[in-house]
Structures are given as structure tokens and as C-alpha cells.
């Protein structure tokens, strides 16, 4: 059993539609635990820094503006194979291609307003977690 951490964002469109609780319930239903969470309003510098790998791409400016358009929830998830399991729960980036019952199939408005973000690898998860959380802000919970 490989217990790992992953990083997740509930994006502005989902926060605006009061979907935080519904998304958290779905995460916890999979057996993963939310071990850190906070609500933020991203600055331009934070959004650009977080999505720096996309700088220069045609969608970069729109993505940054979208992520600054309202509050987001950032959280650290922990569980067995958390990166892969959370990506499966999210579904494909394009909600029209996302599996029925996935977060994006159920909650996304469009490919641009796709409600959630998740790290794509354990390495990305570690980098993204460190971008928003100090280690002492993460509170592992015992598995019962």
C-alpha cells in the first residue's frame, strides 16, 4: 500500500456555485483524506507562478485571469495512490470526454471552467503542495 499526497484546487467556477462541500464529500468517499485546506484569492503573481509551465501558450493569460476571478480552495489530499485516484475522480480536462460520474462530468461548465485541478504526478504534487503550504500546515490523520 503506497500512501501518498496529491494537490487539488477547487476552481473559481465551482466555488461560486457552492460546490466545495459536494466535491469534498466525493473526495472523502474514495477513502482519501483532506489533510490541509485553505481558501485563497490568487494574486496575478501567484497564478502566473503556479501555471508557469504554460507561459507562452495561447491560453495562459485567460487561465491566469480565470484563476484570479474569484476565491479558490487549495487542498492536500492523502491516501493510497492519491495522485492517480484523484485524477480518475476528476475525469478528463474536457468535461465532454470525462467519464460519467467524474467531478468534471458532473460539475464542469466547459473545458475552460472545468471546476477542479489535480497534480499530474507525484513530483508535480510535491511542487504544488509546497507552493501553497508549509509542512506544518499539513495535518496527517490516522487511518481507522
Swiss-Prot record:
Its EC number is 2.7.4.6. Belongs to the NDK family. Its main location: cytoplasm. Homotetramer. InterPro entries: NDK-like_dom (IPR034907), NDK-like_dom_sf (IPR036850), Nucleoside_diP_kinase (IPR001564). This is Nucleoside diphosphate kinase. It catalyses: a 2'-deoxyribonucleoside 5'-diphosphate + ATP = a 2'-deoxyribonucleoside 5'-triphosphate + ADP; a ribonucleoside 5'-diphosphate + ATP = a ribonucleoside 5'-triphosphate + ADP. ATP binds at residues 11, 59, 87, 93, 104, 114. It is found in: Cytoplasm. Transmembrane segments: none annotated. One of its GO terms (cellular component) is cytoplasm. It comes from Aliivibrio fischeri (strain MJ11) (Vibrio fischeri).
Amino acid at each position: 500500500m503506497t500512501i501518498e499526497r496529491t494537490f487539488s484546487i477547487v476552481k473559481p467556477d465551482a466555488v461560486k456555485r457552492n460546490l466545495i462541500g459536494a466535491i469534498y464529500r466525493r473526495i472523502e468517499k474514495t477513502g482519501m483524506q483532506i489533510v490541509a485546506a485553505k481558501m485563497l484569492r490568487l494574486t496575478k503573481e501567484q497564478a502566473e507562478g503556479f501555471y508557469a509551465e504554460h507561459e507562452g501558450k495561447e491560453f495562459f493569460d485567460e487561465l491566469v485571469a480565470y484563476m484570479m476571478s474569484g476565491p479558490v480552495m487549495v487542498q492536500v489530499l492523502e491516501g493510497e495512490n492519491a495522485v492517480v485516484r484523484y485524477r480518475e475522480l476528476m475525469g478528463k480536462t474536457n468535461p465532454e470526454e470525462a467519464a460519467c460520474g467524474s467531478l468534471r462530468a458532473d460539475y464542469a461548465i466547459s473545458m475552460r471552467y472545468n471546476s477542479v485541478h489535480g497534480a499530474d504526478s507525484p513530483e508535480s504534487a510535491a511542487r504544488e503542495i509546497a507552493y501553497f503550504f508549509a509542512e506544518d500546515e499539513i495535518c496527517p490523520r490516522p487511518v481507522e
